[in-house]
């Protein structure tokens, strides 16, 4: 059965407006007030607000949630005068269908899964494993393996992958300054590095620098001409693919840079997050080589593990080792970092220690974030978080992996935990929501790639819990 048919089904439970759950949901101790009236809240609501003629029960009174049946009747009756759903109408319907049913198995490996992402159009899915395998699955063809890549120059693990906008090339990074690029548009399924296909190495070291450093994060620009990378040497690198060289190195932070991304389609703004607890904004149009950012955002009490941009050059979210996800508006940034107090009285290592209980409720005295979301765990590895897709949800949710083996979904505006997906036997380092359909895929250190979908199909989930590992590995 096609996804279009499956996800066209109605479900009265989703029309009730109640929170749904994979294995539990709750309000949680999140710092988002009921009257959260920042512009981002209004923008998010507007993206999923139905046409006023469809949402009115009586003159002058608007319902917060309109049933799917009423929306469809209104569309067929052409109440809006457009003869179709607007993007906001579509989001109003689709955003209530959460991918909480399952899971079904996509793949199982003896090696921990580190990265997993859908392509921009949702046709392909990329998964990377610590043992050196990267697999690209064709989603529309029953998750058939389109490309099976055995990597080279691997040190410890695959830290990140990125698929080019035209979906012809894939880059993968490791704990070395070499990023490899592979032609994934070729007809050959098996891609053994420099045996069946060439994996070209892109050297991010500059100026004869002999120091070895690892790369934690790498991303293609929207036009596919550049790569931006975050490294262990506290720097950000921009690589020009046409010139085949690094054209910019920014000494960005005072500690490891764990995450970096372009803020929008222009490529002018770059966001970065580091173990120095700071998020920084870089504007390449007015950049000077002294490494001065356009601004600094404070709020995390521990290192930043991941950043995801809303894509508008203004808002983004970040995961932190202080066990929080935070929402940011770059218009609140400072020109420099103020004093960051030490709020724990002993050394703490997130890779093998639990987060101190007393620190879970602490707040940065100079917190510039708009909202804070708690409930998930950011331990053992660089856990990733994302905004839900614009097309189907209007980016009204935040979802994140977790060191407690689950995936958490929060309402961006209310802060409520609306779902917790519980299956894995190891930390969920990465997860990805399909850009068009209510489908989410999680990847875990238990080696499992699991698929979650909207309830409504008669299929029974096929994935059994994996056996617990004797030893948990660390990054």
UniProtKB/Swiss-Prot annotation:
One Pfam family cited in the UniProt record for this chain: WD40
Alphabetical UniProt keywords: Repeat, WD repeat
Assigned GO CC terms: Cul4-RING E3 ubiquitin ligase complex
Any one GO biological process: proteasome-mediated ubiquitin-dependent protein catabolic process
PANTHER family xref list: DDB1- AND CUL4-ASSOCIATED FACTOR 11
Entry similarity comment: Belongs to the WD repeat LEC14B family.
Protein's UniProt name: LEC14B homolog
The species this protein was found in: Prunus armeniaca
